[in-house]
Amino acid sequence: MRFLPLLASASALVASAFAAEQSTEERFIKFNRLARLSSPLQLNDVSYKSLTSTPRDYSVAIVLTAHDARFGCQLCRDFKPEWELIAQSWARGDKQQESRLFFGVLDFTEGRETFLSVWKTAG
């Protein structure tokens, strides 16, 4: 049973190392392709780290949320359609990506480690 957390940690480490090797422009191109398919970007711990790693020459606006009913965040569920509307409207208006701004969502179920990290630094 201890093997699974070790495997998850190793996978995250390898993904982080790969993300660090990508240049800012390569990361921009990668996330730009994804954003054209769906905006806001649906992130997880690995993609969040890649998207927000420095240096970068683009901006990110990310909502950390908890949509699952077991977390009891009604505000999260109420805000979701508004955030999606903002992200989609921005994407339609900035087709050439001149603003170099990405919108994203990181849900607790997909980004537990990121939430814990943010909570530690903020609290």
Where are these regions (language model features)?
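Thioredoxin-like thiol-disulfide oxidoreductase module
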Residues: 45-49, 74-123
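Eukaryote-specific detector of the first structured module of a protein
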Residues: 55, 60-61, 67-78
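N-terminal leader/targeting and pre-domain segments
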Residues: 2-60, 101, 123
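Conserved beta-strand elements of beta-rich interaction domains across eukaryotes
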Residues: 14, 66-69, 108-111
